[in-house]
Amino acid sequence: TVLFLDLDEFKIINDTMGHNAGDKLLKIVAKKLIASVREGDTISHWGGDEFTILSKINDIDDNKKLCQRILKEIKKAVQINNKKIDCSVSIGASIYPTDGENIDELIQKADMAMYVSKTKGKDSFTIYDDKINEKMLEKLNLEVEMRKIQNS
């Protein structure tokens, strides 16, 4: 399984409290992720406010439990510079071999599923399925058609 995580409203924290506070929050989130996953799972800071987790879980129900555990742990308020910060994360998951035969495919599909979580609102997870890809292609085609209309 690949999980793709994106902190919700991280830019607001960076912009209002400064990049040092944002960096502290990233470190706290990393510790919370370590506390949430199983031994042997691999966590990486993907960049910015994104993380990935590589897990040997390949069962949908176990994936849901892992995502729920992460959401619960991240949601616990933290103190940075004497200010209480409520944090949440959007998660997308893809499962080997159903969703991809290699890590690139799994990351791409987990990222798409994470985007769906973002559109649902913060603090949620989505397990990838083929309907996500179909909906994204429909949206892309609609945007292309709208641009054609605007430009004509």
Language-model features: locations:
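Conserved long alpha-helical elements within nucleotide-processing catalytic cores of c-di-GMP signaling
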Residues: T1, D8-R38, S44-G48, T52-I53, ...
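A structural signal for short, well-ordered beta-strand segments
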Residues: V2, F51, V89-A93
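Core hydrophobic beta-sheet residues of small sensory/regulatory alpha/beta domains
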Residues: V2-F4, I127
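ATP/adenylate-binding site constellation spanning eukaryotic-like Ser/Thr protein kinases
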Residues: L7, G48, S90, K122
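Residue-level recognition of strand-loop junctions within catalytic nucleotide-signaling folds
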Residues: D15, L54-N58, K75, Y96-P97
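Cyclic nucleotide signaling catalytic output domains
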Residues: I43, R69, E73, K83, ...
